[in-house]
Amino acid sequence: GVVDILKGAAKDIAGHLASKVM
């Protein structure tokens, strides 16, 4: 559903931010 898509996008964004910081 839409919530799952939003959760997936949030995880994807968080992963990109984490990789930039590390």
From Swiss-Prot:
One term under GO cellular component: extracellular region
Methionine amide: residues carrying this PTM: M22
Pfam families: Antimicrobial15 (PF08110)
Protein name: Ocellatin-LB1
Keywords: Amidation, Amphibian defense peptide, Antibiotic, Antimicrobial, Fungicide, Secreted
Localization: Secreted
Organism ancestry: Eukaryota, Metazoa, Chordata, Craniata, Vertebrata
Tissue: Expressed by the skin glands.
Organism: Leptodactylus labyrinthicus
Keyword Secreted belongs to the record: yes
Secreted keyword on record: yes
